[in-house]
Amino acid sequence: MKTACIQMDMLFAQPEENFAKAKRLIREAMAGGPDVVVLPETWNTGFFPKERLSELAEQDCARVKRELGGLAAELGVNLVAGSVANVRGGKVYNTACVFDRAGNCVAEYDKTHLFTPMGEHAYFTPGDHLCRFRLDGHDCGLVICYDIR
């Protein structure tokens, strides 16, 4: 599986600009013919606007699913939409969504091991399950940053 990992200069607390930049970079990455494109952690807000987190957070990843799921389908590429601050059930999670080539959201994962030295535990709710999914017939898993430890 050929993977394109996108590193982007995120604009702090500016999701509109970051969405536009992410979509542009995903399109540019397609020149390399990837099977999957991966965005970084907290790509839509930067890491992370503590005082405005709830205000800037996605609601059930609705915009990510609509815009990036649509882009995955348009480009015919699997897409790991990094992670975004996401409000679900009144709590804020650090959530990643995974889209297949048809734009279907095949997995959602909430970061389980929050990075205490950066204060994540004071703003995010930890996830409570592992993530496993299939892309192009391959079994895949997903971790976010500190989860790898």
Map each language-model feature to its residues.
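Short polar catalytic/cofactor-binding loops
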Residues: 7-13
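Conserved protein kinase catalytic core
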Residues: 13, 47, 114-117
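Cys-nucleophile CN-hydrolase/nitrilase-fold catalytic domain and related Cys-dependent amidase chemistry
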Residues: 15-16, 24-101, 108
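Active-site catalytic loop in hydrolytic enzyme cores
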Residues: 60, 87-149
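Short, solvent-exposed loop/turn segments at secondary-structure boundaries
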Residues: 14-18, 121
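Extreme N-terminal starter segment of soluble prokaryotic enzymes
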Residues: 1-5
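Catalytic metal-binding/acid-base residues of hydrolase active sites
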Residues: 9, 43, 84-85, 147-149
